[in-house]
Amino acid sequence: MSASFSPHTITLIKSTVPLLAEHGTTIIEAMYHRLFEDPQIEALFNQANQKNGTQIHALAGAILAYARNIDNPGVLASAIERIAQKHVGYAIHPEHYPHVATALLGAIKKVLGDVATSEVLEAWGEAYWFIANLLKDREAVIREGIMTKNGGWIHWRRFVISKRIPESETITSFMLHPEDGGPVVPHQAGQYLTFRFDAAGMPGMKRNYSISCGPNSDHYRITVKREHGTGASAFLHDQAKVGTIIECTPPVGDFFLPSVIERPIVLLSGGVGLTPMVSMMEQIAEAHPDAQVWYVHGTQNRETHAMDAHIRALVSRHKHMKATTFYTQRREADDAEAGFITIDWLRANTPFQKADFYLCGPRPFLRTFVRDLIGAGVPAVQVHYEFFGPMDEEMAA
């Protein structure tokens, strides 16, 4: 990913870095205010992340990082891929980009005032369209890849909840079949679906849920923790029944198992972060009999431990798969380690520097293990992670 920005453009963009550091969130707030004057544009965004401010801070941080690296945008390649995948999930299309450009440049002018000269705005317009064109091109490739597969679709598709499976005190799985009776595009183990809940009386509410079953052309399974409040998880747990219709876009995401497994694999999860790991384990059990796999999971206790019996069954089917669970509230009769997963334990009980690590869990869990694994000598290219929510900074930072 190389850009041919002129030295003058680079100088102008970098001159705004101190101002973006100070006023970035104000600029993004003003940008969204302009965008959301159009209800059709507003509906594209996850309004929960708007209300709690996480998306505003995330985008402000991303724009600041872009400005700081305007002379070397290649360092943002992984972020570009994640954004493109997310845009496909949220059904964002090329025709939406001009609206963002107008709102962003207008917000920069409004907040920075006279500092935002015509030259500065022209430089930021050039920088915006460079990234926008990269995203549009990548999103087109992702969509084409989906549509060329049997069962592929674009936009929103209606699915029927065909089964509810209680997994723990707070976690339930939902089996989903397409209402139209057609096939579904097989996902890559680790990917997620994006749901909208307009029909449930929550317009603008969108959520990403990992697929927790192995790839197939018949159905998807999602496994959802009941969170506090009245959002999407509350609707699924308290109101959605067998026969309820929910809508989603096709599977996306850059966190998935490779088609060829060349190194030992360590799957590391905390809480409901186990969901993509179960999908990966099902895929490994089905298609990779010689893969060396260590699954390490942490949760509070037996009552919060979801899908334990299913995971044990998968391990029993695969001669090279091991699973260890840590309970922070372990009782004497529990078949689990006590306390928290540690780097020292992983170093002593897994291939460590020789392995590919796949991580999913709460933000503190991810931040700790991404940082500590790399700090302990695991190459960064062997540490893969999934996080749901705006990525306001790299986990290793």
From Swiss-Prot:
Tagged with keyword Ligase: no
Requisite cofactors: heme b; FAD
UniProt: FAD binding residues: Y192, R207, N208, Y209, S210, F387, F388, G389, P390
Signal peptide per UniProt: none
Pfam families in alphabetical order: Globin (PF00042), NAD_binding_1 (PF00175)
Keyword NAD included in the entry's annotation: yes
Known catalytic reactions: 2 nitric oxide + NADPH + 2 O2 = 2 nitrate + NADP(+) + H(+); 2 nitric oxide + NADH + 2 O2 = 2 nitrate + NAD(+) + H(+)
Record site: Involved in heme-bound ligand stabilization and O-O bond activation: Y32
Keywords, ordered alphabetically: Detoxification, FAD, Flavoprotein, Heme, Iron, Metal-binding, NAD, NADP, Oxidoreductase, Oxygen transport, Transport
UniProt remark on cofactor binding: Binds 1 heme b (iron(II)-protoporphyrin IX) group per subunit.
Region of interest called Reductase, as start-end residue ranges on this chain: 151-397
Cystine residue pairs: none
Sequence ranges assigned to domain FAD-binding FR-type in this UniProt record: 154-258
Domain Globin: 4-140
E.C. code: 1.14.12.17
Binding site for NADP(+): G271, V272, G273, L274, T275, P276
Sites where the protein binds heme b: H87
GO biological-process terms attached to the record: cellular response to nitrosative stress; nitric oxide catabolic process; response to toxic substance
GO molecular function, one term: FAD binding
Function: Is involved in NO detoxification in an aerobic process, termed nitric oxide dioxygenase (NOD) reaction that utilizes O(2) and NAD(P)H to convert NO to nitrate, which protects the bacterium from various noxious nitrogen compounds. Therefore, plays a central role in the inducible response to nitrosative stress.
HAMAP family per record: Hmp
Free-text domain note: Consists of two distinct domains; an N-terminal heme-containing oxygen-binding domain and a C-terminal reductase domain with binding sites for FAD and NAD(P)H.
Entry protein name: Flavohemoprotein
Organism from which the protein derives: Xylella fastidiosa (strain 9a5c)
Organism taxonomic ancestry: Bacteria, Pseudomonadati, Pseudomonadota, Gammaproteobacteria, Lysobacterales
